C-alpha cells in the first residue's frame, strides 16, 4: 500500500510531498532494483488501483530506457543483468496489463516495448511477438486489448534496429493489417495499427518485394486514407509518403488508379494535417526523382545503364499540382510564427522542389498565376504571386528566366514598399534569391540604383523584412565582385558596381547590427554576416571604408569586453557570447582585407582584445573557437611579426589544444598551430616541446573526437617544415604514430567512415611529405638528416600501394600520394625506384592522377612520374 500512496504523490501540487515521493522512488531503485520493478509492475497490472498510481508505476518502469543511445545501451545492459526470475515476473505483469487500462496512451504498451528492445536483440523473450499477434487476431479480444497491443508493436518497430525484426515481419504485418482493415469497427484500433505500419515499413522490404503481399498492403493503406476519422486518414497518408520514398520503383501500378487521386484530394483538404501530407507526398516524389536524375547522369558518364529509373511522375502531374499549390499559397496567416509548419509554407517548399525537379517545364504553369495576381488588391494574392515567383528561380535554365526577372524588377522594387509586411518580407526574400541565383538581372545598369535604394531603405523595415534584405546584400556583393573587371597583374578589382554606394551600405548595416529589436528574426547576426560578405567582396577603391569599419569593430569588441562584469542572467550571458562571436568573425573578415602596414598599426589593440576574451571566456566554446580563428587570421596577415605575441598567447593555445570536450575549439587550435608554423618558421622552435606533447596526448586519448586526429597528423608535417632538423627529437614517436594510423581499417558499408579513412590517409601522407621535405631541406644538396626516415621508406610505399588497391580513394588522397612519391624520389634516389617497380599498383595510381579532373592531382602525378623517369634514365 505504501508504494501506491507514494506513486499517487508524484502528481501532488504540494512541492514538499512531491519531492519526498521522488526521493523515495529514486532510493528504492538504487537499493533493490529487481524487487522495485516487480512491485511497480504489480501496481500497474492491477485494474483495482487508481489510474494515477498505475500511470505513475508505468512511468517509473519506462524510466529504464532513454532517447540518448549511449544511456539507452547502459540501461539495457542493466536490465539484462537482473535475475531472470525477476525479469520474467515483470514481463508477465506488463503483458497482463495490456487491454486493462481505460486511459490513453497505454503505459503498458510503452513498458513492453522498452523491455522488448533490450531482450529481442539478445534472442530473449521469443514468446513476445506471437503473444502480441494473438492479442490482435483473437476474435474475443476487446478494443482496448487490440489498441494497446498494436501500440506496443508500433513502439517496438520504432525503437529497435530493423534487422532484429526481419524474420518476424510476416507475423507483425499480419497483426497490423488485421487492425487496419475497413471491417475493423474501432477507429482507435485502426489508428494504432496504421501508426504501427508506419514504423514497420523499413523492415517489411521482403513483403513489398512480393507482388501479392504488396497489393494487399497498398489496398489496406489506400482504404485507410478514406476513413472518416481524420487521425486515421493523416496516419494513412503518412504511410503513403514514406512508402513513396522507400519503394518508389514499385509504385507505377498504384499511381494512376489510386495514389494520384488520393494525394490530390488530400492537398485540397481544409484540414491542415491532411493537406500537409498530400503536399509532402509530392515533395517526396520530387526528392526521389532528383536523386534518380543524378543516378542517371552518373551512369551515363560511366557508360552503364542506371540501376533504377525515374518515372517522371512530378513532370506528368505539374498541370494538376501547380494550381492547387498556388491557391494554397494564398492561405497565409498575417501573424504567422516562423516555427509553425503549415500548408502555405509546405506549398512554397513543394513548388521549389518541383522547380528543381522539372526545370523549364514548370515555368508555363506558374507564370499565368504570377502575372494575374502580382498586382491583386488582396495582399494574400500579391504575396502568393511573389512567393511563387521566388520559388521557381532555381531549376529552369537561367537564360529562360533572365528576361522574366528583368521584366519583373520594377514591380518587385515597388512591392518592397507594399503596405503589407508579409508582402514586403516575401519580396525581400525573392530579391535575395534573384541576387543569389540570377545576379545579372540585379546588377544591370537600369535597375541597380533603384534596387540599392529600396534595399537600403529595407534595412529600416520590420526585423523579418530587414533580415531578408541583409541576405540580399550578401548575395549582391558576391555577384558584383564576381562580375567586376580585374587587371591581369592584380588579384582584386580596382572598382566595381557597388563602389559608389559602398560606404552608405556599410554604415546602414552597422546601424542595423545595433537595432534594439536585433534579436528578432536573427536580424543582428544576419546584418553582421552581410557586413562580412560586403567587406570580403569589396574592390580596392572601397578600402577607406574598410579601414573605418575595422576601427568600429575593434571599438565594439572593447566595449563588449567591458560589459562582461555587468552580466546578471543566463539569457544576458547567451546574448553576450553571441555578440562576442559575431564581432570576432567580423574582425576576422576585415583583417583579411587590411593591408600589411595597417595591420601592424592595429595589431597590438586587436591582440589585447583577443587575449582579454580568452581570459574571460574559458567557459564558452563557441567564443573560444571564434577567437582562435581571429588569431589565425592575424597570424596570416602579420606573418613573422606575430612572434612578439607568442609568450602572452601560448597559455591560451594550450587551453584550446586541451579542450577536446569541444572538438570545434580543439580543431581551431590545431589549425592555428599549422598557421603559426607557416608564419614563424624556425622561430616557433621554443614553443614546440609543449605543443608536441599536447598533440601527442590528444592522439593517444580515446575521448578526443575522431575528426581532430587527422588534423593533428598533418600538422606534424607543418612543424617539421618550420623547424627542419630540430624535429629529430620527435621523429621516432611521430613515425611510429603515423605507421599505426596508416594501418587503420573501417567498416566499408558506412560511408561516413570511408570518408574519415580517406581524410586520415590524406593526413598521414601530408605528414610524411612535411617530414621528408623538412628534413631534406630546400638546398640543392639533400641534408643527411633525411636519412633518419630511410628505414621507413619501404613501409611508406607499401602504404601507398595499399591505397592504390582501395577503390574508394579520393582525388585528394591521390594528389598527396603522388606528391610524396616525388619527394621520396628527390630525397632517396634510386632506392625508391626499385621499391616502386616492385609495386605496379603505384604506377596505376599515378596514371589515374594524371587523368584526374582536379588540378592538384594532375600536376603532382605528372611531376612524380617525371621524377621516377629521371631515376630510371640515371640507372
Swiss-Prot record:
The modification N-acetylmethionine is found at residue 1. One of its GO terms (biological process) is mitotic metaphase chromosome alignment. GO terms for molecular function: enzyme binding; Hsp90 protein binding; importin-alpha family protein binding; kinesin binding; nuclear import signal receptor activity; nuclear localization sequence binding; protein domain specific binding; protein-containing complex binding. Residues 285-461 are annotated as: Essential for high affinity interaction with RPL23A. Pfam families: HEAT_EZ (PF13513), IBN_N (PF03810). The keyword Repeat applies. It is found in: Cytoplasm; Nucleus envelope. Residues 21-100 form the Importin N-terminal domain. The modification Phosphoserine is found at residue 12. Residues 328-341 are annotated as: IAB-binding. Residues 333-418 are annotated as: Ran-GTP binding. Disulfide bonds: none annotated. Forms a complex with an importin alpha subunit. Interacts with XPO1. Forms a heterodimer with IPO7. The KPNB1/IPO7 heterodimer interacts with H1 histone. Interacts with SNUPN. Interacts with H2A, H2B, H3 and H4 histones. Component of an import snRNP complex composed of KPNB1, SNUPN, SMN1 and ZNF259. Component of a nuclear export receptor complex composed of KPNB1, Ran, SNUPN and XPO1. Interacts with SRY. Interacts with PRKCI/atypical protein kinase C iota. Interacts with KPNA2. Interacts with KPNA7. Interacts with SNAI1 (via zinc fingers) and SNAI2 (via zinc fingers). Functions in nuclear protein import, either in association with an adapter protein, like an importin-alpha subunit, which binds to nuclear localization signals (NLS) in cargo substrates, or by acting as autonomous nuclear transport receptor. Acting autonomously, serves itself as NLS receptor. Docking of the importin/substrate complex to the nuclear pore complex (NPC) is mediated by KPNB1 through binding to nucleoporin FxFG repeats and the complex is subsequently translocated through the pore by an energy requiring, Ran-dependent mechanism. This is Importin subunit beta-1. It comes from Rattus norvegicus (Rat).
